[in-house]
Amino acid sequence: MAGRPHPYDSNSSDPENWDRKLHSRPRKLYKHSSSASRVAKGGVDHTKMSLHGASGGHERSRDRRRSSDRSRDSSHERAESQLTPCIRNVTSPTRQHHIEREKDHSSSRPSSPRPQRASPNGSMSSAGNSSRNSSQSSSDGSCKTSGEMVFVYENAKEGARNVRTSERVTLIVDNTRFVVDPSIFTAQPNTMLGRMFGSGREHNFTRPNEKGEYEVAEGIGSTVFRAILDYYKTGIIRCPDGISIPELREACDYLCISFEYSTIKCRDLSALMHELSNDGARRQFEFYLEEMILPLMVASAQSGERECHIVVLTDDDVVDWDEEYPPQMGEEYSQIIYSTKLYRFFKYIENRDVAKSVLKERGLKKIRLGIEGYPTYKEKVKKRPGGRPEVIYNYVQRPFIRMSWEKEEGKSRHVDFQCVKSKSITNLAAAAADIPQDQLVVMHPTPQVDELDILPSHPASGNNDLDPDAQNPML
């Protein structure tokens, strides 16, 4: 041992101190029994073991490890000397040396199926941790892949074995991928997704893209679609925070999901009741339209009218007009419906908007709905000297509906001929003679059928030169 030089560490500033540490350091780090017996025997055993080839090779590898350990310890001490005392690493050099030796020892072993543990300096995590994290993320329902959110939805009613072997499809909604078991859609066959992955796939109507993914629900946000997917699992849609009820309603209508109080749960009850009231108002007005309004429209149409003005009165209203002095505002052309229920229906502005949309869908035009004053009975008559007496009626505010079914309303107000310059000129040809040539309108460039019918019959060509006043020479 004395004649054999120790390896020199260029990073160490005190080689003699390292030799002294090397001889006095306990050598219990090696777990092999052969190395423990060599440590107990001392320097003479080192000389004997160096005579053998295999032991000499192991001794040289151990010396190389010692040199590398001294290099790490010296670099660690220099790094510690450069740090400020408040952030100095509290790990002692001896403990750090043990950690590094165990790391080198584990790396020198042959590879085994057991996964590596995460090192203190931030090395890669083990396969067990990654599998545990992946299972946790899948149970939470989301994980990130290449910057995009991927949500995994499983059917909770099926066991783990069925879920593992069941079919999965990937839906892309708003650049977000949803991995879903299509059986949850086929359980609701009346919805759009139920038809797509039910009869649509059977008849090859639903086709994926080149990556095998399905792009569905265009125009619907990913947050809304996540809430709608809960409907296929639990039968309830909980409105997410920040999503309005009209937006959720539009998505439900697009996906053919019934929007009912038993299906939708949200905190904004006012918005939910408003949507439910719109549905009820539509159904109610369609009933009123068929039972009360349409018969009056038919009566107006049978009399030759192409529009109808309807006033809704209550059941208690009494209309008593004076035949000698009727109202002078044209109310005599109005149709009257006595219905307190319809009066209460049109009292709300939202219901009038719903009724207007229904009438537009039915093809009617010039729709006006509102509340106006309607005369009910005569209160008094003011007689003016030398003039028409003034009649004062009692007016009540009642709803009214006005609509038209005139197809060519624009042409009825169009003048089809050139107006004459003066009322005294009754001959259109004479009036047209005074019109400049650039504004002259040719009335009938070709003879019409009715003109040919009234043309006088021409006499024979031989009688054209005879004087009608001359006497007949034969007489």
From Swiss-Prot:
Q: Which GO terms describe its cellular component?
A: cytoplasm; fibrillar center; nucleoplasm
User: What spans are recorded as compositionally biased (Basic and acidic residues)?
Assistant: 57-80, 97-107
Q: Where is the composition biased (Polar residues)?
A: 81-94
Q: Name one GO biological process term.
A: positive regulation of phosphatidylinositol 3-kinase/protein kinase B signal transduction
- Say which domain of life the source belongs to: Eukaryota
Q: State the InterPro entries in the record.
A: BTB/POZ_dom, BTBD10/KCTD20, BTBD10/KCTD20_BTB/POZ, SKP1/BTB/POZ_sf
Location within or outside the cell? Nucleus; Cytoplasm
Q: In which tissues is it expressed?
A: Ubiquitously expressed (at protein level).
Output the Pfam families linked to this UniProt entry.
BTB_3
Keyword list (alphabetical) reads: Cytoplasm, Nucleus
Keyword presence, Cytoplasm: yes
Q: Where is this region: Interaction with AKT family members?
A: 146-475
Where in this chain does the record put each BTB domain? 167-241
Bias kind Basic residues: ranges: 22-31
Q: Which residues cross the membrane?
A: none
Residue ranges for the region (Disordered) are 1-144, 451-475
Q: Quote the subunit structure annotation.
A: Interacts (via C-terminal 330-amino-acid region) with AKT1; AKT2 and AKT3. Interacts with PPP2CA and PPP1CA.
Role? Plays a major role as an activator of AKT family members by inhibiting PPP2CA-mediated dephosphorylation, thereby keeping AKTs activated. Plays a role in preventing motor neuronal death and in accelerating the growth of pancreatic beta cells.
Q: What is this protein called?
A: BTB/POZ domain-containing protein 10
- What is the organism of origin for this protein? Mus musculus (Mouse)
